[in-house]
Amino acid sequence: MNVNIYIETSFKGPATRRAAGAWIVEYIISTGRPVTRGGILYSDGTTENDLALCLVEKAFSILTKTCCAVVFTECGHVLRTMQNHWLAQWQKKGWINAKGKPIRNAEAWNRCALLLEHHMTEWTDRPHEYRQCMQDRLRKELEREHGMPAAGYAEIETPEWNTPTCNTERRS
């Protein structure tokens, strides 16, 4: 099965701040119908890297069969880690980087490694048809104060995201 995974965060950079991120998994079922599933994560204090890593974990956690996945993300650290195969190197070295220092968020990286091990993946920062609607949705969600947790992460499941308009009404 071929799958596209889209990861978007509400901000860029290493600063810790209030943020939201969205993930979408898109695939074709046996009837030929495209299906999208996704969610939004909120955090009161996170970095882009940490949030993107959590989003990758959430997206891959719904996959129940081995697949070929193309992952679209603008998070430079996650993208470079995957494209340069650092994840496998860190895992072999006991979660120590090339400088001999412990990997930050080793537990989260390990969870991702376990989720990814049965899949073929390609990682890219190419533009995609969901980017703008995901960013718009994140901006709207962050504007609603009641949607943000006091601390830690909170998650909501989103209805299907329709291509390309991202109509978020449920399909029957």
Residue ranges of predicted features:
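Short hydrophobic segments within beta-strands
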Residues: 6-8, 56, 72
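RNase H-like nuclease fold core
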Residues: 1-50, 62, 137, 141, ...
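RNase H catalytic domain
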Residues: 11-16, 61-137
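Short, flexible coil/linker elements and helix-boundary hinge sites characteristic
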Residues: 94, 146-147
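An active-site-proximal "capping" alpha-helix that borders the catalytic cofactor pocket
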Residues: 53-61
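Short, charged, low-complexity patches
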Residues: 48-53, 105
